[in-house]
Amino acid sequence: MLKKSCRLCNQKLFEKPLLTLHGMPKAAQHFLNKDELFNDESIDLDIFQCMSCGLVQLNIEPVSYFKEVITAASISGDAKKSRLNQMLEFSTKYNLKNKKIIEIGCAKGNMLDIIEEAQMNAYGLEYSSDSVSIAKKEGRRVIKGFIGDIEEIKYGPYHGFVCFNYLEHVPDPKSVINKIYNNLYSNGIGLITVPNLEYLLNTKCFYEFVADHLSYFTIETLKNAFSSNKFDVLECNLINNENDILIIVKKNPQKKI
């Protein structure tokens, strides 16, 4: 069923799409087998904007595997160094050394090793049974589940959370943000990254509009996603040559919405 209201604030979408992309793949993950390839058809992606909060989004149903984080490779080389520096700064600046941090959508848990190296106690939440099994064999503390389905995350509450390019995949980002909020201590800190919509538009990277990505954030709409759900925004910057947005937020139980 096509959505007519915003995924974030539940207000109306503009009636006409901002953009329609023709001949797009039904999904961005999983290779098709021979039979599936024969029967596969492209789709049109209609990209809408909320009349109220401005969030740009698809109005389609999520792909079947949206609860899972699918990554092709481990983190190594320059990427690992960059992530470690990021986590060291996060740990030091926000007094998170030896505190419990959970990664929402952690795949096989490779990032958890880096969080541990930054002297935080790393936990992960992942829906894929295969990924959880691999993570546990590596000695990582990974919990099986999807944040949108869980009221209380095992071993919680947590002092902080991280979420790397996952929020754009979920069909109900408001619910996910609220579930995270409810599993943090009163002053819990979060670090989140998402793709930068303005970069996609400025560089005409229309192939980055995929059925897997349901929400397309700008700095302002990402700030609003958290500030409208009882978080204070502490930082918000462009990273990775402006490909992504990084936001740091703090739970504020006193905040009135």
Q: What is each of the regions a protein language model found here?
A:
Residues L234, E242-I257:
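Flexible, glycine-/basic-rich loop-and-beta segments that form/coincide
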Residues K174-I189:
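A short glycine-rich, Lys/Arg-flanked "PGG" loop and its adjoining helix->strand segment in the class I
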Residues D40-I134, G145:
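Extended interfacial segments that mediate partner engagement and assembly in macromolecular machines
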Residues L8-E15, I219-C236:
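A SAM-dependent methyltransferase catalytic signature shared across enzymes that methylate proteins
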Residues V162:
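A conserved beta-strand element that flanks and buttresses the S-adenosyl-L-methionine
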Residues M1-A79, N237, I248:
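N-terminal juxtadomain amphipathic helix
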Residues G23-Q29, I192-S215, I219-T221:
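Short, glycine-/aromatic-enriched active-site segment of Class I SAM-dependent methyltransferases
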Residues G139-I150:
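Conserved SAM-binding strand-loop segment of SAM-dependent methyltransferases
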